[in-house]
């Protein structure tokens, strides 16, 4: 899918896979062969999204990703 929306009580998070892949390349998120990644609160806030956003000038405040 090019765009995935994660439903969340603090506001849905829309992930534009195509835009991320074009900017960062597959190996920024995927190890080995690209496959679906399970994202939970910990991985989104610590292990994956927020850490990468800090390094690549992406949004790091709640409202930057969680849209009500």
Curated annotation (Swiss-Prot):
InterPro entries linked: Cyt_c_III, Multihaem_cyt_sf
Keywords: Electron transport, Heme, Iron, Metal-binding, Sulfate respiration, Transport
Cytoplasm keyword on record: no
Gene3D superfamilies assigned: Cytochrome C3
Keyword Translocase: no
Domain of life: Bacteria
GO molecular function: electron transfer activity; heme binding; metal ion binding
Processing after translation: Binds 3 heme groups per subunit.
Binding, heme 2: 20, 49, 52-53
Binding of heme 3, residues: 45, 62, 65-66
Residues holding heme 1: 17, 26, 29-30
Entries under SUPFAM superfamilies matching the protein: Multiheme cytochromes (SSF48695)
GO biological process, one term: anaerobic respiration
Name recorded for this polypeptide: Cytochrome c3
Organism for this UniProt entry: Desulfuromonas acetoxidans (Chloropseudomonas ethylica)
């Amino acid at each position: 899918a090019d765009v995935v929306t994660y439903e969340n009580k603090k506001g849905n998070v829309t992930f534009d896979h195509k835009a991320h892949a074009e900017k960062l390349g597959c190996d920024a998120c995927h190890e080995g062969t690209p496959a679906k990644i399970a994202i939970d609160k910990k991985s989104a806030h610590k292990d994956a999204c927020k850490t990468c956003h800090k390094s690549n000038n992406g949004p790091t405040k709640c409202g930057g990703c969680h849209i009500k």
